[in-house]
């Protein structure tokens, strides 16, 4: 009996060791590229940050912030209306929203390009900002958030007390929607910040370099083979290591998204979204 217990204990310990080793290898697989990126970027000594890098960084910030503002202004009312009202076409509209979520963003670029050209906004910042604000996933998240029994009872009580629909939405729904609004803003900013294809198509002209967002500007610099020598086109480098330059620019692209995540982590990691993902 004792030997059987010892054998079971040894098997359990061996299983734990194997599990930890596999988990460590799995973690290392994802961690090594990030660690390399950070350490390689420290090999770059910047004598001067060029105008293009700062300009592209500010462009990305403006585009992402404006797109997130449009997304919040459209997703919350749309999700609230679909969740709390019965109207003709409600179910088809919800199904259409879900179907649009499944369409790859790249598949919508050509129609958006033709539409922007038709209204004479091609190469304009609006050709990038407005599509950033069209966020069907945010509409669906808002719908899930408001489509709960607790909100239904709360809204019905407010209406019984004499509140009109605008007062219910403005004074009750909006203040209570901060968790889902934070999630929509975070997801929209990540999607906008990392979007390369849409700005690349909209800013097709060579004289629109000053309107590039950061990922597009950096990618074109790298794709054009300007990664050797002292100048990378956006920064003056005192190093002869092109990988260091590339790592620095990639880190400059990733870092703002990480900052947004850190700022939003108390919402994302604290269970405030349990009402969203039911």
Listing of model-derived features with the role each one plays in the protein:
Residues 1-13:
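Short, Lys/Arg-rich, polar N-terminal cytosolic tail immediately upstream
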Residues 11, 15-278:
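A structural signal for multi-pass alpha-helical bundles of membrane permease subunits
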């Amino acid at each position: 009996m004792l030997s059987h217990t010892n054998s079971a204990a040894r098997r359990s310990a061996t299983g734990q060791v194997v599990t930890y080793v596999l988990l460590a290898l799995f973690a290392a697989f994802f961690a090594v590229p990030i660690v390399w990126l950070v350490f390689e970027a420290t090999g770059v000594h910047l004598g001067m940050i060029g105008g293009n890098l700062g300009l592209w960084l500010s462009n990305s910030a403006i585009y992402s912030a404006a797109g997130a503002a449009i997304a919040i202004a459209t997703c919350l009312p749309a999700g609230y209306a679909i969740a709390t009202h019965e109207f003709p076409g409600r179910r088809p509209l919800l199904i259409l929203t879900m179907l649009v979520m499944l369409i790859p963003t790249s598949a919508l670029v050509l129609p958006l390009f033709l539409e922007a050209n038709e209204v004479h906004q091609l190469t304009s910042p609006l050709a990038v900002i407005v599509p950033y604000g069209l966020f069907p996933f945010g509409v669906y998240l808002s719908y899930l958030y408001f489509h709960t029994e607790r909100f239904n009872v709360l809204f019905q009580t407010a209406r019984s007390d004499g509140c009109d629909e605008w007062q219910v939405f403005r004074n009750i729904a909006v203040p209570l929607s901060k968790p889902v609004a934070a999630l929509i803003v975070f997801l929209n900013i990540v999607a906008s910040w990392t979007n390369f294809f849409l700005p690349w198509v909209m800013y097709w002209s060579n004289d629109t370099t000053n309107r590039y967002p950061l990922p597009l500007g950096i990618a074109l610099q790298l794709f054009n083979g300007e990664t050797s020598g002292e100048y990378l086109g956006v920064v003056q480098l005192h190093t002869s290591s092109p990988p260091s330059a590339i790592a620095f620019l990639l880190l400059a692209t990733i870092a703002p998204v990480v900052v947004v995540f850190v700022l939003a982590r108390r919402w994302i990691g604290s269970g405030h979204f349990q009402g969203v993902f039911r």
